[in-house]
Amino acid sequence: MKEKTVITNISIVNEGQIVVSDLLIEKGRISKIGSIGQRNDCKQIDGTGKFLFPGIIDGQVHFREPGLTHKGDLHSESKAAVAGGVTSFIDMPNTVPNVLTIDILNEKYRLASEKSLANYGFFLGVNGDNLDEVIKLDTGRLLGVSDDGLYFTKKGNLLADNPETMEKLFANCKSVIAIHSEKEQLVEENEKRYREQYGEEVPVEFHPLIRSEKACYESTKRAIEIANKYGARLHILHLTTEAETHLFRNDIPLIEKNITTEVSVHHLWFSDADYKRLCTLIKWNPAIKTEKDRQGLLKALLDDRIDLVTTDHAPHTLEEKQRPYFQSMSGAPIVQHSLSIMLEFFKRGLISLEKIAEKMCHNPAILYRIEKRGFIREGYFADLCIVDLNSAWTVSKENILSKCGWSPLEGTTFQSKVTHTFVNGHLVYDNGQFNETVKGVALIN
């Protein structure tokens, strides 16, 4: 097998511009961008008419290993990821056991080194039970700490609901603090009101009223106020409301921001009008909200109040999703389709290719200080994906790669397709075929 690859005559989407050029990959890195032409010592890929992106860095996934592997695992979900152009991911701490110690964190890195086709990183979990231990760590060496998913323990340890805990963490933590931001007191009050009216048969259409705009806004506003008090690096996960977007700045570059946020692709794609058709299949926390919110999120993404696009990929079995509203699990698989969704917005004239690369590739690398990735530059790791903007395909059970085997996007036709994905210079995905002999590497040393 030839260790070098040359991609010729491809439109490179990178750092605010699109340039047609050749690109040479050798020893896992981008060694040259410029005129290269045909070379007998290289694998050749003709990029004519196609577009080359930096590999997507997904800053929020739930790949379910260890402990929840009937839903997904590091191999199955990373396979779905690379098929969608995702070359790196950061996994959340709500696996079993929760990632509340360095030993458990290191075990996840070990598992990923054996199983993941993509590069990998993991948040250290933080809640009221392990706060003192987290503060003692050199958190500057972590990708980040997060409470996401840990509120499902029902111990009252959701960070956003504990201002004293936030004060202590924000005053002492040097790394990114990524939080799930909803005011649980308001959520519980809303739930009680609808239970009194409907009992256990509350329709899923009320999910965005139970997990309401007010619950999100008040929580996010308070977290930002406390973070600003200490100069903490606060990142609000999966923003869902237009109101919240006005709490974030766009007058300084990302590298200078301490307060940042993201939007997950499903909150850009779906609105509350879709609950009637898809029911609990699109039950996420925070909830998918109104069309006004959806459009407001897209506007904030375009004007840089929102910094990242992520997936919050969270597979559950179909049986777990199709239960009645209160029993149905929140979350769904979507990592395979995130770039396709954003490219569909491009085809509709709603976003540029350059902005997609900024929000899905460049900015995650900047925010999480991931070295030599997220950009197409000579000397950087060759994490890349090739896209055909004129190759329509339809999501079906036959082409869904997530272990759970279903998607709320089934039946959706996308106009663009990922054709090739490189991870550290290795062609791991090639038009439906996978090279599973090579594995990704850790995003931190």
Show the residue positions of the predicted features.
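C-terminal cap of metal-dependent C-N hydrolases
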Residues: 10, 324, 378-444
